[in-house]
């Protein structure tokens, strides 16, 4: 999926549409996790990242521990390259503009760990990351449909800033 998002899809888009270098990436939940990983570790092609209710700390997430053990083996040091919180602790990705949105009533907040991720970002001097907790929203479709316009407008503004 990483190669598809960072190489194959941009190549198809650039071959068929008129685009410049101002490109952003957005994802929700596990897709938000992927968007954060790509944003933190890739200098190009994405200048902005929007992560909606992202999984931010895979090392302590019961959803990912079993999968990581099966796919990557038991060594948690190997897993760190796939954990946004660990990447921020190592100082990578300060160049990209990132926005994180999540609902205050997200039933998976204990797994997403957005609050902890925000604290780690602040402690490590990440100035290009903003966090937006939306009161009364959970993890689902209504949350996404309610915030998507605001998030897209923000992505556009961040992409067109010089």
Residue ranges and their predicted role:
Residues 1-162:
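Non-catalytic cap/lid and distal C-terminal segments of serine-dependent acyl enzymes
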